[in-house]
């Protein structure tokens, strides 16, 4: 039996039909029909999130023009939304591979423990502290990946556990204390991570760069091709000799590093580290991924959708308050968005597969 993998297009999983089973379905060869199905499903989700983004933004502009026609609010979005958008982008790859990581908010805090330890122990070397934070994030992601792939426990269960484990470890290591980082504002690391470039917040610049890198990894690199096949059909991936365990572990490591970077940026921006950092980013990041068109079932995802989804979710909080509602509605709307997005993708997937 031979298996062929088509080139992965933006958001479309590779076709994994076997030549022996390339039967005609409604007059179309099976492999070609799968490719057409993936193409339609992908572009439907990307066009959908783009139209939703424009519609919601126009609604906010009409209902609250004083707020949403002021350039300052967009500078604010460019500073704050990347904190969860960066993680959502790498989380997209994890979900495409058929896994999920719910521990990233706690990894943000744990990585900052490494930052504080190096920064306080090496005469204020913020640049080395950033590298230490990234190393801790990578180690936390490696722990998740190994636990999931070697022990064989579902990622959902493992990362719920490590979310509490990493948060508890953070609290124990810093004894529940916060740390001021005011002196870090005069460093190169501060200017590179949360400064300004031509008036644009560096958080947004990094978010765009990471989005571009994620796109290249997911659609133009073997890692992304493997992730698509693993998420779409793990048995087929085994038959094709794809390194399933290594692929999944690498994606968890990348998400851990993204969480660490987001934690460092957040702490530098507010010039303070607090152990509960990242606690409010779980729902926004998940909502960005799913509303952006990534399938909860794995095998299909879109970086463009996640990027737009993150800024759509980031604008909802401000929009709710600007139109006169209280912030009590925020989590209600986040939860509703996740459920609706997952339901729509499930219905579309069943419809396209018929």
Question: How should each PLM-predicted stretch be described?
Answer:
Residues 155-221, 247-250, 269-278, 353-354:
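Transmembrane helix-bundle core of multi-pass membrane transporters
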Residues 35-41, 95-100, 121, 138-181, ...:
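Short loop segments and helix-boundary regions at transmembrane helix junctions
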